[in-house]
Amino acid sequence: MTAVQKIKVLCVDDSALIRSLMTEIINSQPDMTVCATAPDPLVARELIKQHNPDVLTLDVEMPRMDGLDFLEKLMRLRPMPVVMVSSLTERGSEITLRALELGAVDFVTKPRVGIRDGMLDYAEKLADKIRAASRARVRQAPQPQAVARAADSHPAAPMINNPLVSTEKLIIIGASTGGTEAIREVLTPLPPDAPAVLIAQHMPPGFTKSFAQRLNGLCRIAVKEAEHGERVLPGHAYIAPGHAHLLLARSGANYIAQLSDEPPVNRHRPSVDVLFRSAATHAGKNAIGVILTGMGRDGAAGLLEMKRAGAHTFAQDEASCIVFGMPREAIALGGADEIVPLAEMSRRVMARLATMGDRVQRV
């Protein structure tokens, strides 16, 4: 695609109102155009052949063939960048996470028809996601039951009732586009006694709880949505809720999680920079910072602050990123001690931890 060519977008949604609104938003952007719309996947299949779109926006739930079935077939036969369009429901969030496992690049929530408040922000986010998707590295759908096999090999870790109450070592992770699958790949190999993990992943409210529950069924550590004021424990991962910044703080000898409803930073709440900066302040050399795939620059400055505070820092390499935005910016600032392929990230992090020593206080 040359610089003068617009990004061609095919919108698939069973609602004529949503198709019209998405078309209006996309066509208002100078660098993209809706080449066609479809009310269901069967019509979309023919339009893909005719128009060869650069990006597909795909409704999660539709008649005749649902979005997941269509996505799975599409990513096996003709992989292309797909942005899922999902409702803000528990079922919608679970289906969307499955779509990301199947190879969708990203997702947006459905626009609220008839409500103009917030529409400019929505339009900006939609356009950003389409631009990122058009440049994304698309991967084929995994083999059937691959994720289920991973779950079987890593049974869910129980929440600890009488836990270790303090650890000096922490793993701090930030991600955006493509991050849900990257985070899964980093977390699943971690042993049950791994240090606590704090995660900021760009996600809207309503999705992070389902994301945490899904990971908890795949990992040997316990994974949960972070709660304000809770003690940060080894063998646990804490995911920032979609409506709040996650910060690390200290209470005596212990780390605690704090949530903040302060305004977005780098247009995001939760923000990776907010989490990384709090880790630089309160954990310093006892933390490891990891920046994964994602568009934009959120987390780049924060990773550099962690490094300057003595933390060892990792950035995902370009070849394994869905979108090489946030890691690229962090590397350009000099914030990354190591640049690592995603498949090696967990092993390299644990190897680094082994050189840092292990001092854990029991009660």
UniProtKB/Swiss-Prot annotation:
Enzyme class (EC, first level): hydrolase
Domain Response regulatory, first and last residues per copy: 8-125
One of the protein's GO biological processes: chemotaxis
Family annotation (InterPro entries): CheB-like, CheB_C, CheY-like_superfamily, Sig_transdc_resp-reg_Me-estase, Sig_transdc_resp-reg_receiver
Keyword Zinc-finger on entry: no
Localization in the cell: Cytoplasm
Major location category of this protein: cytoplasm
Family as reported in the entry's similarity comment: Belongs to the CheB family.
Name of the protein described by the UniProt record: Protein-glutamate methylesterase/protein-glutamine glutaminase 3
The organism's taxonomic lineage, starting at the top: Bacteria, Pseudomonadati, Pseudomonadota, Betaproteobacteria, Burkholderiales
Gene: cheB3
